[in-house]
């Protein structure tokens, strides 16, 4: 399975400069304001970029100036490189190729591409770089690879070319395979369980291609699974029953008044009464969304979940962590958490600590050394072995051994 194994990011929001490897499971911890949300926001931007909606995302994010590290007076571009390899903590980060972009602000507060490059393996086994438009060539020498060449693109375009790019026939398969790895990166956020949340409303029956980021089409998606993927549906139902024993089953059907509509309904043991989504607790409703996401048959290549522990009982967190581990054999997961109990369910290699580092250097008019930034740290079992003989990961977090405390 191809995973996003290595990422370099510069100039994005609180992230001045980041270079880090990623594994099958990545659990981000850190205090409020450290930069977890900004890291997740980068993937939101990437997803919108690949979908052809970069400028809309920039506008909704407050403009280019708000997206650059301390604004355009300090930072003149956002630079990112993403590389793909085999899953696991021991891997060749560059094995399958990569994707590189540089975005710079315009006078009207938009972002435009300075460059956009797909890195791919040439049939001769060297890793080549293919620009997405014709132009001059120049040599590149990344540390991880040899014999690199770059076909530089023209620059100046406002939306990504990778999704619709058609390379030369001789290179088609190699480049197409890398282009297919670039997204989608969907951030799932099941926080809204208010009375007006989409998850509680009647929705379109046929809106079932994928589970929406807010689980707004949960009823339609579950109905599709019931009809086409009964095994996965039963896994979801079983998971819900483990944390909500009186739950018998979902009672999913097209609306009698409009056969193109559907609403989330359910039943409990010993009764034929149909309950609605408003009669589920917030935590139970979120858990149903999470179970559906992680137990579906066709997982997105990379899943990002923001604070999945909200409203869940400790026993539900254990079950959720088990589903995360199971899903990690078919997809890559990036999670943020503030829960000590949830953190205890994972391995040291899964943990990434994010902290805010404020420089002690004075900030002057001609220097930016005094500005703060988000700093990322990975952990491993070897360095924590002695600690883990006596303490859990959660306790080490509370003791600030892992960092990530206010």
Located regions from the model:
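Conserved ABC ATPase signature
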Residues: 234-295, 302-318
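Electropositive, glycine-dotted interaction segments
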Residues: 91-242
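N-terminal pre-Walker A segment at the start of P-loop NTPase domains
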Residues: 1-16
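C-terminal lobe/lid and adjacent interdomain/linker elements of RecA-like ASCE P-loop ATPase modules
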Residues: 321-406
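Conserved P-loop NTP-binding catalytic core
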Residues: 41-109
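Phosphate-binding glycine-rich loops of NTP-binding sites
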Residues: 24-61, 287-288, 336-339
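ABC ATPase nucleotide-binding domain "signature" loop
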Residues: 30-33, 307-313, 342
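Phosphate-binding P-loop
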Residues: 17-23, 295-298
